[in-house]
């Protein structure tokens, strides 16, 4: 998203005096396309937006703004398709954050880490 990139870049530029941001490189690209071109990844951490539900809609006010920005730029949230693309990247491990009751993207999970409302599916 060009808008999100601009907002993040502006925030980073305003925080230049903080050491952690000095080594941060922000790239404006589709994450899946970029991951397929890049060759230096060992691990991918995939944290797709959770599907909307009545229960979590009230708690995700700030994320709703991000969803609106993506809709304005006609960027679709398709985590299943993104997972398929990211699965083709030659990496050692992929960690996928999912709602605890959500179906996994693939049945080839090597192991899982469970929390109260979230789980992490790990593919090796």
Task: Tell where the protein language model's regions lie, with residue ranges.
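Glycine-rich nucleotide phosphate-binding loop and flanking beta-alpha elements
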Residues: 35, 52, 102
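Redox-cofactor binding/interface segments in oxidoreductases and associated redox assembly factors
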Residues: 45-46, 96
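Residues that form generic nucleotide/phosphate-binding pockets
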Residues: 7, 11, 69, 85
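S-adenosyl-L-methionine
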Residues: 1-43
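Mobile active-site "lid"/loop adjacent to the S-adenosyl-L-methionine
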Residues: 48-82
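Conserved Class I SAM-dependent methyltransferase catalytic core
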Residues: 78-124
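A short acidic (Asp/Glu
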Residues: 8, 56, 105-108
């Amino acid at each position: 998203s060009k808008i999100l990139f601009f907002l993040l870049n502006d925030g980073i530029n305003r925080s230049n005096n903080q050491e952690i941001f000095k080594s941060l490189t922000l790239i404006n690209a589709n994450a899946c396309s970029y991951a397929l071109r890049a060759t230096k990844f060992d691990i991918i951490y995939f944290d797709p937006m959770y599907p909307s539900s009545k229960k979590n809609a009230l708690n995700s006010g700030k994320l709703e703004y991000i969803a609106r920005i993506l809709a304005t730029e006609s960027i679709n949230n398709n985590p299943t398709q993104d997972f398929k693309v990211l699965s083709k990247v030659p990496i050692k491990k992929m960690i996928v954050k999912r709602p605890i009751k959500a179906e996994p993207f693939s049945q080839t999970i090597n192991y899982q880490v469970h929390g109260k409302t979230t789980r992490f599916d790990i593919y090796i």
